[in-house]
Amino acid sequence: MTDVQKDTCLVGIDIGGTFTDIILIENEEITVTKVPSTPKDPSQAVINGLKHLNITSGEFVHGTTIATNTLLENTGALTALITTKGFEDVLEIGRQNRQDLYDFNVQKPEPLANREMRYGISERTDSNGVIIEDLDTELLEQIIYGIKSSDAESVAVSLLFSFLNPAHEQSILKTIQSKIPSLYVSISSEIVPEFREYERTSTVVINSYVGPKVSQYMDNLTTKVEHPIRVMQSSGGSITSQLASKEPVRTILSGPAGGVVGAYRTAKQAGINQIISIDMGGTSTDVSICPDRIQETTQSTISGYPISIPMIEIHTVGAGGGSIAAINAGGSLSVGPSSAGSDPGPACYGIGDNITVTDANLILGRIQPDFFLGGTMQLDIDKALMAIQKLATEINSSATDAALGIIKVVNANMEQAIRTISLERGHDPRDFALLPFGGAGALHACELSAEMGISKVFIPPHPGVLSALGVAIADVTKDYSRTVMLTPGEETLYQLETEYSGMESNARSDFNSEGLDTSNLKFNRYLDIRYVGQSYELLIPFPTSGIKDSKELQTLITTDFETAHQQRFGYSDSSQKIEVVNVRLKAILPSTTQIPTAHISKSSSIGMPIDERPIFFQSTSLMTPIYQRSDIQLEQNIKGPALITQFDTSIPVFPGWVANKDELDNLTLEVV
């Protein structure tokens, strides 16, 4: 392959715990590669992948785990917090609700800004945004001196009601930047201009906590690649690397968001509107539900810390191909959340002796050692067997039964995740198709579907690198929000239109400042609505049809809210008044890149098996034909038992299932 030159290609990059995926879209064709991740320097795996595909330049879009790992591993910057005097302990106090109501030993996560690094400043803005006490500039000078003496690496600023009037936060920002130019500083009125001081403070502290490391990584990667890089946000759109460095909290679920975008658009292209996506990589599994749209939330919790920014609604469990199996203190088999990663990796990698889900699938024959990554990486089945035999001895079983047990446990973890995002949110999983992706997702698809009553599995052409594809084709987006606290009345339509007009003007200005053509800029409007007196809201799309007056608007949003409330919580109450809490705007510059399609023609011949080997389905070993996915023809039925292999995954077709390929090279597995 010759070197790929600028403006001829689009490159999607997704860094996982085990592999880093690179996808190249060039001349309406897709080329993919997977290289081992390099945890000590994640950018090195990116460079290795680009070299493998001989990519020298192009348009780069990156799904990154730097912010995620920094938060999960507590390896962020020494962070100071400046807040309104008397509110220094808001991070410590938090909310009264407990994550596990009946756990007497529940451990709250330590605040990311410890007590001696939290500073109170004399100032006050009231609930109408009016300054009633000026900022104490002399005290601010003392605080800055204390921060400088403490060797703090970053500062977060969160003042009461700054979302209504950010003047004091902006003044603090300018003063710090003039005194300590090298210090990383975030202010809450820029990151999340919304009410609820605990969640707002937590979000801006997280931003400052992960900021220096993300900023350093972005600078390092941009220097190595020598071209601008866009970065995937948790909300499913891309931003510049500069904005990602300034607001890295928006990238907390960067990679998983790319996967959902790739899954949703691939399914939509094939005419499938309702999917449950399940991204099973090396370390974890990310599950999301798309009922004819990608679902977003504005209130999330990561590692015990609340984050109030728009994110695709994703539920994550510690169940991946590299998840380690062991016997716990109670003598039971457990799988995960610890992962073997890429180094040393599963036992079959030949480096360590960790027993993982990948080893179990290999021993059961669902992964064939000579077909892994297209035969470019040979797996050591003897090492896997030796490692799993030790586990089997502990539980007095055979190696095969131990492997089956590992699969059952990890499947149970994923089944619970599917229930959480479907049944617990008012959706029947039987109404959806399962779309498994990631390197390990398809291996578990038939069993998961059978347990959940799902009758259709949809597998796109490149499931192992679908997150990288989603990252590459994502729209350019930016989210805006503002707290309004409106009870619908005669002036509601005018008030909301005024807010939206201001945000749309800001969006155009922001996109223009990035040198982007805004002629195709679109705006999606949303409202956070609740019943008066509730402490939680639901995200409701703002009506798009022409609205005559505030009365019609009130009727429309009330109906939409009550429908959503009924689905989510099982009831609604038309006698209760509603309240608009926040207005939200998503500015979207649609991607011009479409998913390349194969358009397979029907053939008179059919793809033949390349081999036949014993494979365990449930507890039974069956002689099973093995097919190369590329050999399977349009509308050719592959009845289970069968194993379909390709570069980035393996697909066991269980007895009672049949696989069929469509003209876009997608595989559909259905119950016979």
Protein language model features and the residues they cover:
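ATP-dependent carbohydrate kinase catalytic cores
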Residues: P42-S43, G49-L50, S189-R196, R200, ...
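Glycine-rich phosphate-binding loop of actin/hexokinase-like ATP-binding domains
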Residues: T33-T38, A80-G86, V106-K108, E247-S254, ...
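Terminal amphipathic helices with adjacent charged low-complexity linkers/tails
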Residues: S158-V204, F542-T544, V580, L585-S603, ...
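N-terminal glycine/serine-rich phosphate-binding loop of ATP-dependent small-molecule kinases
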Residues: M1-T79, E133-V155, Q170-S188, P212, ...
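Gly-rich Lys/Arg/Thr-decorated short loops/hinges at beta-loop-alpha junctions or inter-strand turns
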Residues: I23-T31, N97-Y102, P111-I131, A152-E153, ...
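Short glycine-rich, Thr/Ser-proximal phosphate-binding strand/loop in the N-terminal lobe
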Residues: I13-P42, P111-N128, Q378, K478-T487
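Active-site phosphate-binding/coordination module
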Residues: A77-D126, V130, S188-V192, G470
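C-terminal, non-catalytic interaction/recognition modules in large multi-subunit enzymes and RNPs
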Residues: I15, E138, Q142-G146, I272, ...
